[in-house]
Amino acid sequence: YHTLLSRRFDRTQEGKRIHFASAMTLLGLEDGDNATNGHGYLDIVDFILQNCTDVECNLQELYRRVAFNICIGNSDDHFRNHGFLLTAKGWTLSPAYDMNPTLNAYQSLLISADSNKANLNILFGACEDYMLNRKTAEKIVSEVIDAVKNWRGLSIRMGLSKREMDMFARVLDERIITEIVG
């Protein structure tokens, strides 16, 4: 069995707490608030615009995460799985967490004003809602696609067994064919 040990992003090296809050908390939302009742990533965009430091960087990072979620089929992208850290300069996106590949064709959250379909073309169409121009959006998505296409090499370097890789292959290869290639 493999065990993943990760460094907590809500603690300093000395063990002191860095304030963390989920997007659900900061947006004043409740469990179950998602695409079905009109909520989505653009709610997070609004929070970033109004409350975050380094707005441009945070918006680009959010867009990158949406693209990644689409590319791996992570539909567990509800508001509790997005968070912010309070730094001396203000709120900033926390490191990404709880991202798991699936074959789902829809996101939990709207990726545009009116769609939660896991589709990069819909995300491209919404790039200005994320305050990005098309060129920047295309660059971000290209980087995400390159990373996802190279999942096998990373898996080998990380020591995943053939059995584990075979489990992920069905999901990731299907997503690559559906979203990236075709």
Predicted regions and their residues:
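Anionic ligand-binding catalytic core segments
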Residues: 1-182
